[in-house]
Swiss-Prot record:
GO BP annotations, alphabetical order: cell division; DNA replication; negative regulation of transcription by RNA polymerase II; positive regulation of transcription by RNA polymerase II; protein ubiquitination; regulation of cell cycle; regulation of cell cycle process; regulation of mitotic cell cycle, embryonic
Record protein name field: Transcription factor E4F1
Self-association state and partner proteins as the record states: Homodimer; binds DNA as a dimer. Forms a complex with CDKN2A and TP53. Interactions with TP53, RB1, ANP32A, BMI1 and FHL2 regulate E4F1 activity. Interacts with HDAC1, HMGA2 and RASSF1.
Factors inducing expression: Up-regulated by estrogen.
Region (Mediates dimerization, DNA-binding, transcription repression of CCNA2 and interaction with HMGA2): 184-263
Length: 784
C-alpha cells in the first residue's frame, strides 16, 4: 500500500449524538462495522492489509462484496459505487441499539488476529471527503473516521474528562458509557503506529495492549504492599521483589536476575562475565511419564532412567530450565538448556523437555506451551540449526515408556552451532588480506573494503572525546576509545589473575595461556596469537614508512615509533621515577631503571638518629675516632649491629663523594641506606672494610680500627657477606666514585667495574679493591 492509511477515531458522548451524526451522513452514513458488542466479548476489525495478504478475501463492509485482489478492493471503496446491503440480524442488545441507533451489518473477522477494541462505525461521508483530500497529501492513502467505545470504566470517585480534553484525545480512555477519541495510524508497510510514542506494531491488538502503558489507570494491585501497576506483567515482576525469585540465570557467571531484560543487559553491558565455563556434564535423570502427569512422588518401581553425557563449549545463550529433579523433588543437576529447532527426521528422536513436579501437565501440548511461554518470558533467542540424523540417539529407558521425559538433550552442544558473527569472522580470516591501508597499515581482503575504511580517515568525525578531544567517525569507536581514560582495572584473568581495563583485553590476554594462533601472516604464513601482533609483523613486509618525522624526515612504519623518536628532538621525558624524580623518554627505560639490582640511588635519604627511632642509621665523622651502633630489626629476625669508625682529619680535608648512577633498582632495606650513606660521606683515601663480629668489639675491629684512613663495618657473621655484596652493588654497574679534591696514599690507578660475576669471584678471592681512575679513592671490602 503506497500511502499511509490514517484511521481517525472521533468520539460522541451520547447515543443521541451518534444517531444524529449518522442521519446527517445520509446514504453514506455507515460504511462498515468492525465490531459488535456481545455478552462474551467484542468482535474485531481485521488488521490492515499488506503484501502478504494479497491472496486473502477482502470483503466490503458496506455492500458485502468480496475481492481477492487488494487493488480491486481499494478501487471499489474509492468509487463509492457500492450500495448498502440489506440489513441482517444483529444481536439485539440495549448497548447496540443505543450506540448505533439503526441496524448494522457485523463485519466478518479477517485472517489475522482481530482488533479487540469496542464498537467501530465507519462514516462513509467523512471517508469520501477525507479520501479526496488525503489522496493529494499522502499519495492514495486512506483516512477513516471511526468511533471507538471506551472499554475502561472509571472507578469510584473518578470524574469523566471533558470532551476534547488531552487525556481523551491522546489516551483513548473516558468515563462509563462514553466514547474515547484516539488517533490510530497505519503506515505504508501495514503496521500500526502509536500516535503518542510513534512505535509500530504488527496488529491492532498489540497496539491496544501498548496503549495501556500511556494510561494512568493501574488496575493490578499488589496484595503485599498495595502498589498498583498498569499491566499484569509489571505486577508479576514487582512480586519477585517480595519473594526474591530470580528465574533468569547467566550461563557464564551464574548470577541470577528477576527480569529477562536485566539478564540481557548483563550480557550486553560494559562489564560482562570474563570467564566462559568449559563443562563436561554427566547427569542421570529419573522420572516417569506417569509421575510427571500426576505430579505425585511415586516409588522407584515404575521409573524410567535416562543418561545423557555431553562435552564441549557452552553456547552463549540464556538458560530456559534451571533445575532437574527426581521423583522425590531432589535436585539432580542444574541444566542450561539451549533450544534448537530440529529437522523433521529428528523430531521423533528428540526427547521431551524436563518437567518439574511443581508444574504437573496433563498433555504433551500443554508441556510444549509451558516451555514456549517460559522461553518468551525469559527472552530466549531461538537459534535455528540443521542437525544431523545421527547426532542424537534416544536413551534407553528401563521400566517405562520408550520416550523419557527429562533427558536434557535439547542442549545439543555436540553440534557446536556457531553464531553468524563467528562464521563470518572465520570465513573472513581465511581470505588473504592483500590490500593495506597507507595511513594505518591495516590490511583488507578486497579493494572495496579498503576504500570504505579510507573514508574513516578522510570523512567527517562528529563524535569527539570530551577528555582528550580526539574525534571519531562513529559513536561506537568513541565509546571504545573512552575505555583508554579509565584507570580502574576491573577485569581479571581467571588463569593468572592479571587485571585489565576492558573485557577485550582479557580475551586477547587469555590467548597467552593457550597454544592457539588464529592470525596468520598473509605473506609468509607465520601465525600469531593476537591480531595486533599479526599487523605489526605484516608491516615488516611493507617498504612504505608513512609516519615521517617533521624534524629529520626519518620515516617509521608505526606511529608509536615516530612518537618515541620525536621525544629525542623535543627532550620530552614523560615517564618519571617516583623515587628519584628522574625522567625517561620511554616507558621501557623507566622499567629497566627500576629493575636493576643496585636500586634507585639519586635520592639518598639522610639517616637521622633520634631517641624515638632506634632503627635509624647514622654516620658520625668527628675529631676523635669513635664507634656508633645501629640496630636493624627489619632486615632479619635477630638484631644486627653496625660499627662505623672514621677519623676527623680526613673528613675535614675531603669533599663529599658524587655518585653517578647508572641503572640500578630499588633495594628497600636498612642495609642499603647505611651503605649508601657510608659511600656518600667517605672521603678520598678511606678504606671500607667489612668484618665479622664473632667476639667482643675490640677483637672484631682488629688492627684496621686503628688506621686513620679506614672505615670498618662490623656485622654479625650471618650478614657479613650480604653487607659486602650490597656495598659492592652500591658502586657497581657503571657507577664511579670520584672525589674532587683530597690526597690519597694509594698508588693504584685502575678501575674495576663490579658486576654479578665479580661478586662471585669476590667470594673466592676474599678481597676486592675498587679504585677511581685517578687513584683518589679506594674502597676495600673484606669478607672474613
Amino acid at each position: 500500500m503506497e500511502g499511509a492509511m490514517a484511521v481517525r477515531v472521533t468520539a460522541a458522548h451520547t447515543a443521541e449524538a451518534q444517531a444524529e451524526a449518522g442521519r446527517e451522513a445520509g446514504e453514506g452514513a455507515v460504511a462498515a462495522v468492525a465490531a459488535a458488542l456481545a455478552p462474551s466479548g467484542f468482535l474485531g476489525l481485521p488488521a490492515p492489509f499488506s503484501e502478504e495478504d494479497e491472496d486473502d478475501v477482502h470483503r466490503c463492509g458496506r455492500c458485502q462484496a468480496e475481492f481477492t485482489a487488494l487493488e480491486d478492493f481499494v478501487q471499489h471503496k474509492i468509487q463509492k459505487a457500492c450500495q448498502r446491503a440489506p440489513p441482517e440480524a444483529l444481536p439485539a442488545t440495549p448497548a447496540t441499539t443505543a450506540l448505533l441507533g439503526q441496524e448494522v451489518v457485523p463485519a466478518a473477522p479477517g485472517p489475522e488476529e482481530p482488533i479487540t477494541v469496542a464498537h467501530i462505525v465507519v462514516e462513509a461521508a467523512s471517508l469520501a471527503a477525507d479520501i479526496s483530500h488525503a489522496s493529494d497529501l499522502v499519495g492514495g492513502g486512506h483516512i477513516k473516521e471511526v468511533i471507538v467505545a471506551a472499554e475502561a470504566e472509571l472507578g469510584d470517585g473518578e470524574m469523566a474528562e471533558a470532551p476534547g480534553s488531552p487525556r481523551q484525545q491522546g489516551l483513548g480512555l473516558a468515563g462509563e458509557g462514553e466514547q474515547a477519541q484516539v488517533k490510530l495510524l497505519v503506515n505504508k508497510d501495514g503496521r500500526y503506529v502509536c500516535a503518542l510514542c510513534h512505535k509500530t506494531f504488527k496488529t491492532g491488538s498489540i497496539l491496544k495492549a501498548h496503549m495501556v502503558t500511556h494510561s494512568s489507570r493501574k488496575d493490578h494491585e499488589c496484595k503485599l504492599c498495595g502498589a498498583s501497576f498498569r499491566t499484569k506483567g509489571s505486577l508479576i515482576r514487582h512480586h519477585r521483589r517480595h519473594t526474591d525469585e530470580r528465574p533468569y540465570k547467566c550461563s557464564k557467571c551464574g548470577k541470577s536476575f528477576r527480569e529477562s531484560g536485566a539478564l540481557t543487559r548483563h550480557l550486553k553491558s560494559l562489564t560482562p562475565c570474563t570467564e566462559k565455563i568449559r563443562f563436561s556434564v554427566s547427569k542421570d535423570v529419573v522420572v516417569s511419564k506417569e509421575d510427571a502427569r500426576a505430579g505425585s512422588g511415586a516409588g522407584a518401581a515404575g521409573l524410567g532412567t535416562a543418561t545423557s553425557s555431553v562435552t564441549g563449549e557452552p553456547i552463549e545463550t540464556s538458560p530456559v530450565i534451571h533445575l532437574v529433579t527426581d521423583a522425590k523433588g531432589t535436585v539432580i543437576h542444574e541444566v542450561h538448556v539451549q533450544m534448537q529447532e530440529l529437522s523433521l527426521g529428528m523430531k521423533a528422536l528428540a526427547p521431551e523437555p524436563p518437567v518439574s513436579q511443581e508444574l504437573p501437565c496433563s498433555s504433551e501440548g500443554s508441556r510444549e506451551n509451558l516451555l514456549h511461554q517460559a522461553m518468551q518470558n525469559s527472552g530466549i533467542v531461538l537459534e535455528r540449526a540443521a542437525g544431523e540424523e545421527g547426532a542424537l540417539e534416544p536413551a534407553p529407558a528401563a521400566g517405562s515408556s520408550p520416550q523419557p521425559l527429562a533427558v536434557a538433550a535439547p542442549q545439543l552442544p555436540v553440534l557446536e552451532v556457531q553464531p553468524l558473527e563467528t562464521q563470518v569472522a572465520s570465513e573472513a580470516s581465511a581470505v588473504p588480506r592483500t590490500h593495506p591501508c597507507p595511513q594505518c597499515s591495516e590490511t583488507f581482503p578486497t579493494a572495496a573494503t579498503l576504500e570504505a575504511h579510507k573514508r574513516g580517515h578522510t570523512g567527517p568525525r562528529p563524535f569527539a572525546c570530551a577528555q582528550c578531544g580526539k574525534a571519531f567517525p562513529k559513536a561506537y569507536l568513541l565509546k571504545k576509545h573512552q575505555e583508554v581514560h579509565v584507570r580502574e582495572r576491573r577485569f581479571r584473568c581467571g588463569d593468572c589473575g592479571k587485571l585489565y581495563k576492558t573485557i577485550a583485553h582479557v580475551r586477547g590476554h587469555r590467548r597467552v595461556h593457550s597454544d592457539e594462533r588464529p592470525y596468520p601472516c598473509p605473506k609468509c604464513g607465520k601465525r600469531y596469537k593476537t591480531k595486533n601482533a599479526q599487523q605489526v609483523h605484516f608491516r615488516t613486509h611493507l617498504e612504505e614508512k608513512p609516519h615521517v618525522c617533521q624534524f629529520c624526515s626519518r620515516g617509521f612504519r608505526e606511529k608509536g615509533s615516530l612518537v618515541r623518536h620525536v621525544r629525542h628532538h623535543t627532550g620530552e621525558k614523560p615517564f618519571k621515577c617516583y623515587k628519584c624524580g628522574r625522567g625517561f623518554a620511554e616507558h621501557g627505560t623507566l622499567n629497566r631503571h627500576l629493575r636493576t639490582k643496585g636500586g634507585c640511588l639519586l635520592e639518598v635519604e639522610e639517616l637521622l638518629v633520634s631517641e624515638d627511632s632506634p632503627a635509624a642509621a647514622t654516620t658520625v665523622l668527628t675529631e676523635d675516632p669513635h664507634t656508633v651502633l645501629v640496630e636493624f630489626s627489619s632486615v632479619v629476625a635477630d638484631t644486627q649491629e653496625y660499627i662505623i669508625e672514621a677519623t676527623a682529619d680526613d673528613a675535614e680535608t675531603s669533599e663529599a663523594t658524587e655518585i653517578i648512577e647508572g641503572t640500578q633498582t630499588e633495594v628497600d632495606s636498612h642495609i642499603m641506606k647505611v651503605v649508601q650513606q657510608i659511600v656518600h660521606q667517605a672521603s678520598a683515601g678511606h678504606q671500607i672494610i667489612v668484618q665479622n663480629v664473632t667476639m667482643d668489639e675490640e677483637t672484631a675491629l682488629g688492627p684496621e680500627a686503628a688506621a686513620a684512613d679506614t672505615i670498618t663495618i662490623a656485622t654479625p657473621e650471618s650478614l657479613t657477606e650480604q653487607v659486602a655484596m650490597t656495598l659492592a652493588s652500591a658502586i657497581s654497574e657503571g657507577t664511579v666514585l670520584a672525589a674532587r679534591a683530597g690526597t690519597s696514599g694509594t698508588e693504584q690507578a685502575t678501575v674495576t667495574m663490579v658486576s654479578s660475576e665479580d661478586i662471585e669471584i669476590l667470594e673466592h678471592a676474599g678481597e676486592l679493591v675498587i679504585a677511581s681512575p685517578e687513584g683518589q679513592l679506594e674502597v676495600q671490602t673484606v669478607i672474613v
